[in-house]
């Protein structure tokens, strides 16, 4: 997808964009970015690690790179979703359903929220558990069609996809820097929140 390549373009491209932005002047109306671009910018500002993939082969390759980078090749991956475990059955994962034995959590999400770069999740992903009960590191598999403008759109999407039984335990993950990494960034909004070291494997499906 050319849009995501544009987002992660060269430094010279970014400088050119910044100059054009300055030329607009401070009194010009702000340009409204597309929701996928807004999400990517906000997500990275929150400390998330973003890997855009055009197909499943790239997803598997990126996953293996994450495992190597963190020395997780021999570690256990917490996977609650059986369908997700089947999808990644050919990868180098060592799946478990034990919270105590796992080093990281592989999951999906409900939606990706463009306005604040957060991930919307529910009991479909985390059952009735609290985020603090999970490993510090998350690997989230999602698709570009899951990007929504705001939480309201995300909640409406959850309702429309689950007409028979609306999931519970709906929450967002927004802070993607572990507490020791954000000591210089303390503020009252992040107090008490559950921070996660989070990788997003984003598959193009539009």
Model-predicted segments: where are they?
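The feature marks the mature, well-folded catalytic cores of soluble enzymes
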Residues: 2-206
């Amino acid at each position: 997808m050319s849009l995501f390549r544009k987002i992660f373009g060269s430094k010279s491209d970014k400088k050119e964009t910044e100059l054009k932005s300055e030329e607009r002047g401070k009194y010009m109306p702000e340009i409204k970015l597309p929701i996928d671009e807004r999400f990517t910018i906000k997500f990275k500002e929150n400390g998330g690690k973003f890997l855009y993939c055009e197909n499943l082969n790239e997803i598997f390759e990126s996953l293996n790179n994450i495992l190597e980078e963190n020395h997780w090749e021999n570690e256990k991956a917490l996977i609650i979703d059986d369908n997700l475990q089947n999808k990644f059955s050919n990868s180098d994962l060592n799946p478990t359903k034990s919270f105590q034995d796992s080093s990281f959590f592989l999951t999906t999400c409900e939606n990706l929220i463009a306005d604040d770069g957060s991930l919307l999740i529910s009991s479909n992903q985390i059952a009735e558990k609290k985020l603090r009960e999970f490993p510090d590191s998350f690997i989230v598999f999602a698709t570009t069609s899951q990007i929504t403008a705001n939480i309201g759109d995300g909640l409406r999407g959850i309702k429309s996809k689950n007409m028979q039984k609306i999931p519970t335990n709906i929450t967002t993950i927004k802070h993607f820097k572990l507490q020791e990494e954000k000591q210089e960034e303390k503020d009252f909004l992040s107090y008490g929140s559950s921070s996660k070291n989070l990788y997003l494997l984003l598959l193009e499906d539009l």
